[in-house]
From Swiss-Prot:
GO terms for cellular component: cytoplasm. It is found in: Cytoplasm. Homodimer. Probably interacts with PlsY. Its EC number is 2.3.1.274. Pathway: Lipid metabolism; phospholipid metabolism. GO terms for biological process: fatty acid biosynthetic process; phospholipid biosynthetic process. It is an enzyme of class 2 (transferase). It holds the Pfam family FA_synthesis. The lineage of its organism: Bacteria, Pseudomonadati, Nitrospirota, Thermodesulfovibrionia, Thermodesulfovibrionales. It comes from the Bacteria. PANTHER family: FATTY ACID/PHOSPHOLIPID SYNTHESIS PROTEIN PLSX, PHOSPHATE ACYLTRANSFERASE. This is Phosphate acyltransferase.
Length: 345
């Protein structure tokens, strides 16, 4: 049975939503959820015991990393719920870790305790986003605000491996987010990254503009973490605003209530597609383990779905796939360099 460590104290609505999300999961699938945090509070929120497919255990931790806390001070404390949850993966006592707490601290702890995969220069946050054709993966969504062209290329390879594992795709289309479709447009980072991606083995379809990413023209959209996080937050805010505007417009017309009843199924379907809680959390790629960062205001449903994503990624050995993909790329590059040296000698 897989074991998933959950930082029970992380997030705006902790520990209740983390505990309820875990409880909902063990009713559906065979998995052990290890809740890490204030034991007394955790047990007070656990529903009465009944027969479930999975099990829930508790590991006490008497310290919590606050959402507005300085990362360096958070890392120095050894008994936080987040740190102890990540340490379970490091010790082999859990197969994956999930937290809706301080995202910067979660990234740093995952990086420091679990380490990077071989040949990975920078881990990246990969998030699944909705589009007209289903879903696409955006990375980096906030781990690295300053990048080199080579980092974006690695993000692309990691994103490809993630897409293949998540959606069973064969050759996902990779695009570089920029201000124009032409390779000559953008800043120095994107122009150089365009050249490198074009010469790679990836199914690189070129640059993609911000207005096109939600139309499904690419399966994986690559950018630095500064741009990616803005795209993510704009997408979330726009979806919420559109839902509110639609409800207001319906309420303002005489036949609003009747009209709403007629289109209610469509609105419900749309809300589900753009609701971040449906996707659980964002996977930290490039780490030697499965680490998922959830939204700070995650609901019980978001935590439940994040746990399910974690179990799927462990079963599909996502970090092994990423490592193999990058190793193959490294071998090709070394082989090509050897050929070039021979030609020049």
């Amino acid at each position: 049975m897989l074991k998933i460590a959950v930082d029970a104290m992380g997030g705006d609505f902790a520990p209740e939503v983390n505990i309820l999300g875990a409880y909902e999961v063990v009713q559906d699938i065979e998995v052990e959820i290890i809740l890490v945090g204030d034991e007394k509070k955790i047990k007070s929120f656990l529903p009465e015991k009944k027969e479930t497919k999975g099990i829930i255990s508790v590991i006490p931790a008497d310290d919590v990393i606050q959402m507005d806390e300085n990362i360096s001070s958070a890392l120095r404390r050894k008994n936080t719920s987040m740190r102890k949850a990540v340490e379970l993966v490091k010790a082999g006592k859990a197969d994956a870790v999930i937290s809706a707490g301080h995202s910067g601290a979660m990234m740093a702890l995952s990086f420091l305790l679990l380490g990077k995969l071989p040949n990975v220069e920078r881990p990246a946050i990969a998030t699944v986003m909705p589009c007209l054709k289903g879903h696409f993966i955006l990375l980096d969504a906030g781990a690295n605000v300053d990048c080199k062209p080579e980092h974006l290329v690695q993000f692309a390879f990691m994103g490809e491996a993630y897409h293949k594992a998540l959606f069973n795709s064969q050759s996902p289309k990779i695009a570089l987010l920029s201000i124009g479709e032409e390779g000559s447009k953008g800043n120095e980072l994107t122009k150089e990254a365009f050249k490198l991606l074009k010469s790679s083995r990836l199914n690189f379809v070129g640059n993609i503009e911000g207005k096109d990413i939600f139309f499904g023209q690419a399966d994986v959209v690559v950018c630095d973490g500064f741009v990616g996080n803005i795209v993510l937050k704009v997408g979330e805010g726009l979806a919420e605003a559109l839902m509110k505007m639609l409800k207001r417009e319906i309420a303002d017309i005489i036949t609003g209530k009747l009209g709403y009843m007629m289109i209610k199924p469509a609105i419900k379907s749309f809300r589900k597609k753009v609701d971040y809680s449906e996707y659980g959390g964002a996977l930290l790629l490039g780490i030697n383990g499965t680490s998922i960062i959830c939204h700070g205001r995650s609901s019980a449903k978001a935590i439940k779905n994040a746990i399910k994503v974690a179990t799927e990624m462990v079963k599909k050995q996502i970090y092994t796939r990423i490592s193999e993909s990058l190793n193959q790329t490294e071998e090709r590059d070394e082989s090509q360099n050897s050929v070039n040296r021979l030609l020049c000698s």
